Amino acid sequence: MNKPFSDNTKPTKKHPQRRRIVYIIAIIIALVGIGLVFYAHRNLTYDHGTQAKLQQAGFQEKQAKLPDGSVLNYGEGPANGLALVLLHGQQVSWEDYAPVLPELAKRYHVYAIDYYGHGGSSKNPMKYSATAISTDISWFIRQHIKQPVIISGHSSGGLLASLITANVPDMVRGLVIEDAPFFTTEKGRAESTFSWRSFKDMHDFLASGQSNFTQYWLDHTYMQTLFNAKDPNAWDKIVKQPALQYMKQHPGKIPRIWYYPPELQVNTLFDLTANMQDKTGEYDLRFGQTFYNFSWFNEFDQTATLKRITKPSILLHVAPPTQSGSYYDEHGVLASAMDDKDAQRVHELLGSKNKLIDNIKSSHDIHKDQPKVFIEAIDEIARH
């Protein structure tokens, strides 16, 4: 027979240690969740504050209308020193210089210009050549800035800055060339470069009748060969499938994948596909097509142009990619703007007034990856 419970039986004790463990786990889960929210927010909005920062630094977006009706869009900073003209690289706009503009604006009067086919400037293919663009920017310098300038150009903007310096030396104090594709854009050499193959994608897309360039790019870009060098499925897993899934859920939008931080530059790859033709951006793919068929280079002799430059200049040139240690991939395709021999040739053609700063540990965008190096180069030219 079971004994009845005695009156003095104590109630079962709860386990405070177990409860504390549960609380700690709950807090950890909450913190991880909050961390993921902040992580995703940063990855999705890392560039959303650009305009506010530029306005805070005193920049205003303006437009100049040329006698023939063409429009040059530009960002102008406060008048805090010598005039400085900045010419961006291809597929972006003047805001691409945002990482260095606030600092430069403290001691220069900055004019960051969208050249034709980009940003808010005219989209007239008749103007898509080095000679036409450099002529009109020279007009802008003479008619609007009205004083000699320091001029710097990135990538194809560096080609333009060099041509302007050669053509109107009375309106230029000095030149900074940022990783410009000298000689590698010439017919016979260009076909073995990553850049030319990218322009071929633009040409082929325009001829295809398809409506979404980002999707076309995902299927055809030579970039997938670089990604798949060690893993044949890397491009699909890392880039293509996440992008296609995003575009399925957000039709007409450029992919922005929440789990990729800006340092990996995967979302930057997507951003560079934004274009006027499919209404995702302001870049005119017909501009890139002129690099594919070489019409952009009509009457532009790169060697002769460099020889004609008499102003002080600095050439900034990046080091080979750290992954491969070479400017070329395993198929002999140039994956950079120039190799070391090209940079040395530019340096020699520019003569004794040129300084070559080589092997900069940076991607193609030195002003973003190494802003201090870029700003110091501008300051050095200003001291001449």
What residues fall within each predicted segment?
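Conserved hydrolase catalytic core segment
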Residues: 147-191
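Flexible "cap/lid" loop of the alpha/beta hydrolase fold
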Residues: 176-220
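Active-site loop/oxyanion-hole signature of alpha/beta-hydrolase fold enzymes
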Residues: 67-68, 75, 115-152
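Active-site nucleophile elbow and catalytic-triad environment of alpha/beta-hydrolase enzymes
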Residues: 287-305
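Catalytic histidine-centered segment of alpha/beta-hydrolase-like enzymes
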Residues: 362-370
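Conserved loop-alpha-helix segment in the C-terminal half of the alpha/beta-hydrolase fold
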Residues: 314-361
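Conserved HGGG/HGGXW glycine-rich cap/lid loop of the alpha/beta-hydrolase fold
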Residues: 70, 76-120
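Alpha/beta-hydrolase fold catalytic core
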Residues: 2-84, 106-108, 146-147, 338-345, ...
